[in-house]
Amino acid sequence: MAHKKAGGSTRNGRDSESKRLGVKMYGGQVIKPGNIIVRQRGTEFHAGYGVGMGKDHTLFAKIEGVIKFEKKGEFMRRYVSIVAA
């Protein structure tokens, strides 16, 4: 009679699904209203002119134009704006 003792179960083998965060459209690119520019957790980038912010801090275009990334203000915050083309 062939017997094999059962192996123990493992406690590994899990990982969370990636959230696909990051910059989706870059400076100089032409963008349309509603297009996503940045997906982020918190305000790594702030919304400038022509850019809206969703409840999960996603930045999206409100107008058509060209994307511009800039640092400004006392704390040199990074802003994303849209320059009308």
Swiss-Prot record:
GO cellular component: cytosolic large ribosomal subunit
Cited Pfam families: Ribosomal_L27
Keyword Ribosomal protein in annotation: yes
Database matches in SUPFAM superfamilies: Ribosomal L27 protein-like
MF terms (GO), sorted A to Z: structural constituent of ribosome
Database matches in InterPro entries: Ribosomal_bL27, Ribosomal_bL27_CS
Keywords: Ribonucleoprotein, Ribosomal protein
Region listing for Disordered, in residue ranges: 1-21
Domain of life: Bacteria
GO biological process: translation
Gene3D superfamilies linked: 2.40.50.100
Entry's family note: Belongs to the bacterial ribosomal protein bL27 family.
Name by which UniProt lists this protein: Large ribosomal subunit protein bL27
Organism: Pseudomonas putida (strain ATCC 47054 / DSM 6125 / CFBP 8728 / NCIMB 11950 / KT2440)
